[in-house]
Amino acid sequence: MRAHRINAYEAAPAAMKTLVAVETYLHQTTLGARLIELVKMRASQINGCAYCLDSHSKELRKGGESEQRIYLLDAWHESPLYSPRERAAFAWTDALTRISETHAPDDVYDELRRHFDDKEIVDLTTLVGMINLWNRLAISLRYEHPVP
C-alpha cells in the first residue's frame, strides 16, 4: 500500500472546515462525548480504518473509558458491559455502516426509539454518516496512525 496520498486539509480547506463544523455541532448535542467516541470507534472497526481506530481509542481512554469496554466493543452484542442505550446506538451504527446490506431495519430503528428522541436519532444518524465519511477519507487518502 502506498503512503499518504493527499492532505485533505491543504487540498480542500473549505470542505474540511465544514466537516469540522459538523463535528463541533455533534459534540454540543445530548449524545455525550463517550457515546460519540464509542460510535466512532464501532464504525471504524467495521470499516477497518486503522487511523480512526487509533484516534478514537485514544480519545476514549482520555475520557476515562475502561480498557475492557474498548477491547470488547467489537463484540458489543455479546458483552453485558454496555447499557441498553449504547447497545441501541451500536446496532444503529452497524446497520447504517452496512446500509447496502441492511437498509436500516425496522426492528433496529424501533429499539433505537426506546432510548433516543427524534432529535437524538437525527444527531446519531448524522454522527454515523460523519464517521463513515471520515473513515472513507482516511482509508482512501492513506492516512497513517502514529507509530510509537
Regions found by a protein language model. Give the residues of each.
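Hydrophobic alpha-helical segments
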Residues: 1-148
